[in-house]
Design a protein with these regions (language model features):
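Intrinsically disordered, low-complexity segments enriched in serine, threonine, and glycine
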Residues: 2-137
């Protein structure tokens, strides 16, 4: 019996329910793409009230990528005109170190202006709780 796997899903909506099927909160990668002028873009979790915001203006074609490094530090890069730069300094000082909590996370891509030109994509790996055999030795 063959079972298919869902690798991605595209929806046009102001609210996006991202379901974390795992047992633990997990970091995620978000890409904010601009199809026009977008002022102070942000991602908001309507369930928890947390947000990650930026004090910047995105131009058409710009991409902000928010992710965690291999040492679990928050990182941000801006790709503008084909040039990639470190954009950590653009973070709004009131931003939260957001994770996707187990269950439903209702996220929105928001902006002070130009929100209709902002497109967000979210990716993550769910985590399960367990004990590794080598830990029990």
């Amino acid at each position: 019996l063959f079972r298919s796997h869902q690798y991605s899903e595209w929806r046009q909506s102001y609210f996006l329910n991202v379901r974390n099927p795992g047992a633990l909160p997990v970091p995620f990668t978000a890409k904010l793409r601009s199809s026009g002028i977008v002022v102070n873009p942000a991602i908001r979790n309507s369930t928890t009230g947390e947000h990650i915001g930026f004090d910047t203006t995105l131009n058409k074609g710009d991409v902000l990528e928010i992710y965690r490094t291999t040492t679990d530090r928050l990182a941000v890069k801006l790709i503008s005109g084909g040039v990639e730069t470190n954009a950590f300094a653009l973070l709004d000082e009131d931003s939260d170190l957001m994770e996707l909590h187990p269950g439903d996370n209702v996220l929105t891509a928001d902006a002070a202006s130009g929100r209709e030109g902002l497109q967000a994509s979210i990716s993550f790996y769910p985590l399960a709780v367990g004990i590794l055999p080598e830990v029990m030795k």
